[in-house]
Amino acid sequence: MIKKMATEDLDRFGEKIIEGFQLSDDDLRALLSLESEEELEKLYYVARKVRNHYFGNRVFLNCFIYFSTYCKNQCAFCYYNCKNEINRYRLSREEIKETCKALKGAGFHMIDLTMGEDPYYYEEPDRFVELVQMVKNELGLPIMISPGVMDNATLLKAREKGANFFALYQETYDQELYEKLRVGQSFKGRYNTRRFAKEQGYCIEDGILTGVGNDIESTIKSLRGMKSNDPDMVRVMTFLPQEGTPLERFKENSNLSELKIIAILRLIFPKCLIPASLDLEGIDGMVHRLNAGANIVTSILPSDSKLEGVANYDRDLEERDRDIKSVIKRLEGMGMEPAPQAEFETVLRC
């Protein structure tokens, strides 16, 4: 559908999306099948046009605090699965408080509090709620929580104490693939937890993996599945094999690239937040993701931080170019800039 379009046709296509045009499954198949660089650049062009209509050259910045890498789950793709014999950490309350002090006035729009499904917090969930309240009191910024499949009562308490956003990724809506990835975890339970959070006034984020055994049809199923959540943020991440996991040696020559899917997400979810994560390729990767239609930079770490990300391409590097100053400098070089905080809170509506 995009292959033979000239620039004026691409502009019209972007306008159709802005006016409310919904892509059919056949449209998605055509877009997911694009391969040549010329075709993909056309797709990215339309995605940027749609994004710029709603957000201009302004970008949002999300600080990532992975405060516990302990987890009770056995996700086949995840470095932190409970069977992997790795060094782990759990920040103390005081360490988290000190991290917050270092973040004051840095320019972040939102703080993402992320953990594995750590039994320390799952057995005493009020500990988690108290952390949310402390970070909210320290920084006064919107808070995203990424704690896994928390019980409804704890989600309600966290909401009351200042949490605004709830992130819980389905990874795939292909149930057969899901069972291989999230071993022993309920597909419906995960979906219903996210729906409950939405009903209680949270903004929600959903996400999928690519390059992990998904084909075009399962990717369409996932895109449609995310749509059914009415999400506020949608993401896709490339699967990166992790040492010590069941999928450590998994290799796939997939043409379903993260950048392609980011652009398609922008056409399906024109007003949504779509992340450009630093977790896989750092700031250079951020540039490519923004050029594909993303509008929020995630996995920014506090300056000089030794905290983990999720996939950590830079785990063994001495210098980790993932602080907010480095991000802003590169944004300025792209002709982009951080949005005012008030604009982010208008986008949130939660």
Curated annotation (Swiss-Prot):
The lineage of its organism: Archaea, Methanobacteriati, Methanobacteriota, Stenosarchaea group, Methanomicrobia. Gene3D superfamilies: Aldolase class I (3.20.20.70). Its EC number is 5.4.99.58. Pathway: Amino-acid biosynthesis; L-pyrrolysine biosynthesis. This is 3-methylornithine synthase. Catalyzes the isomerization of L-lysine to (3R)-3-methyl-D-ornithine via a radical-based mechanism. Is required for the biosynthesis of pyrrolysine. It comes from Methanosarcina acetivorans (strain ATCC 35395 / DSM 2834 / JCM 12185 / C2A). (3R)-3-methyl-D-ornithine binds at D112, S146, Y169, R235, S277, T298, S299. Signal peptide: none annotated.
